[in-house]
Amino acid sequence: PELRPETYGFSKKDYDRKIFLDGVLGIQYGNLKEILKILKKTYCSNIGYEFMHMGDPDEKSWIRDRIEGPEKDIKFTENGKKAILNKIIQAEGFEKYLHVKFVGTKRFGLDGGESLIPALEQIIKRGGNLGAKEIKIGMPHRGRLNVLANVMGKPFKAIFSEFFGKTVSSKKDFEGDVKYHLGASSNREFDGNSVHISLTDNPSHLEAVNPVVLGQVRAKQFFHKDKERKKVIPVLMHGDAAFAGQGIVAECFAMSGLPGHNIGGTIHIIVNNQIGFTTAPRFARSSPYPSDVAKIAQAPIFHVNGDNPEAVVHCAKIA
């Protein structure tokens, strides 16, 4: 009933009456029919937005300006769509090859979450356009090999050698570690902007890498003399169960606004495969969504289906 205009005193004859909106929803005047059409298109389609819990009116307006309005569709050029498709094909082809070539070998595939790859590409491209010089990534096992191959540019030879128990690396200290613990670094160039990307090594302990990445970012910002905290971007990826269940996640959010720990914000990506090892969501958390922990820091949250890669990339662009 809260979604019906009648709840707020509107009657049927009000549906065609013009209302002055002063730019809200991207229009100056609109009747209830037009307003409802825009609201349904924005909030009842491919992306679910949570931002009304945020305390800063300017931050809420910033998000509204980018999602509400008759012209705020998810739009990509022909080349943009081809780039997204190309990355999806690369991600899926990589997983299929590993499944055929190394049957039964533990690899923590990205099956079903392939949209993560074009989303990361968008973050790198958009970040470079906005002046970012470095992107620090921390992530769990799930999809790590795919990210190493298709985002970081790690040679396939090195990845496949690790399946045979061989290490192609100058880092002798890392020999013998499992392939989905290893990190990498590389330089990527988009639109003439060079961005250095590094994926931090991490142990089997889920989410333990988070404060390491955040500390690296803080140090890099210091060396870049980046007082506005815009040159180095942290990106942390999570599984749904670990994000809600590991206390270190809440601790990092609780410290994020403190003067000694503030890094200007973090992009978090939750790859939600609806299960934590063997635990169903209803046995894993008390809240509806795993992302509810992020409300500690009044962070905006976007819910998007992984089978809609254009919507996923659109969210990455806003982030």
Task: List PLM regions with ranges.
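Extended, charge-enriched "interface" segments that sit outside catalytic cores
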Residues: P1-L116, A132
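ATP-dependent adenylate-handling ligase core
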Residues: P309
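Short Gly/charged-rich anion-binding patches and loops
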Residues: Q122, Y289, I318
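Cofactor-binding active-site loop characterized by glycine-rich and histidine/acidic residues
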Residues: K136-G306
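Active-site pocket-lining segments that scaffold enzyme catalytic pockets across diverse folds
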Residues: Y97-K157
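Structural signature of the thiamine diphosphate
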Residues: V312-A319
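Structural motif corresponding to the C-terminal cap of alpha-helices
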Residues: E92, K96, I124-G131, Q216-H224, ...
